[in-house]
Structure formats: C-alpha cells, structure tokens
Amino acid sequence: YLHKLGVDAIWLTPFYVSPQVDNGYDVANYTAIDPTYGTLDDFDELVTQAKSRGIRIILDMVFNHTSTQHAWFREALNKESPYRQFYIWRDGEPETPPNNWRSKFGGSAWRWHAESEQYYLHLFAPEQADLNWENPTVRAELKKVCEFWADRGVDGLRMDVVNLISKDPRFPEDLDGDGRRFYTDGPRAHEFLHEMTRDVFTPRGLMTVGEMSSTSL
C-alpha cells in the first residue's frame, strides 16, 4: 500500500523498551524492541520487505535523555559508579534545587535523590534523566547505538530534541526566564554533532534530521 502511494521512506517513532511515561521517548534500552511492538526479528523482516520495495527506514533517536529505568541510570544511583558521570548531578538541599530551571513538562527541572543527596537534571519528565554529553564515554555509547541499527539496515536517524544536548556548564540561575536559554543550542552542540557525523553518520551513509526544540526561525 505505501509503495503504491509512492512512499520512499518510513519514519518510525520510538519502539524501544520503555515504561511509556512519554510515549516511548523515555527509553530504557536503545537496542531492544518493546514487546508491545514486536521483536528484532520482526524489525529485520520489516527492513527486508521495505528495501525490496525501495522504501528506506528512519528511526527516532532519543539521545538527550534516557528513562530512569535504563540500566545506565540504575547504576548511576551509586555515587561510586562510573555511570554516575553518564548523567548530570548537582549538589543542593532537599527543598533547594541547584538553579531555577523549569522542566518543559512543568515544575523544576531537578529531581532530588535522597540516598546520594544530589539532584539530577531532567528537562522533561522526572523519569527522563538528561545524559551528560560532556562525558566522551556517553558519546561513545550513543555511537554504538547508531552502529547497531545501521548494521540492521537503517537508512536514517531523526534526532529528538538534539539541540538540547549541550548545557551551559555553569548551570546559572535564569533571572529572566525558565532556563532554556542556558541549555538550548548550547556551547558544544555543534561540536558534538560534528563528532557524531564524522564518526558514524557519514561513514555509515545515514541521513539525519534534527528536532530543534525551542528554536525560533
């Protein structure tokens, strides 16, 4: 049917394992398909059938944050774990967040973790912890995710809220707003994306498109 319509590419929104707090944009495993949608074998068959009809497959990559159910975040709850640095943690008091930034879903962008006595950043739901792109190991792991799907025949990636991946490292108070000017189109966003392009997107021939949250034309 899609072939007869002249469709030559299909963009699939997140189908990864997820608690579904945000319609799958809270990813708990980047390389596993939620049983609700099927299996990796089903995906491979989809790719095979699509390519036989000249239809390319584009996947949604949610790389600004993960679900707090992701194995990385579960490990990060231990302050001594190397995964602690996969996320953005800051000191504060139980009732006093590190700054006044607001979540796009309402309320503070910081959630207190009592056991480790620090806050973690979540620009969206509290169940969506922001990844620390300043950590090269995080970037390396995300490249592996892209490679995994490229190996399965994916042709392109749609990068969710990709212009939020670089935050002002000072994490200053925003005296005139909700903080978005300090994390939108941040200081290293272009650098990070150039690195991904050099190391993965170009070598694998992946088409990419980025969602630019809070960016005006």
Predicted regions and their residues:
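Conserved protein kinase catalytic-loop anchor
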Residues: 154
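Hydrophobic residues within beta-strands of alpha/beta enzymes
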Residues: 10, 157-159
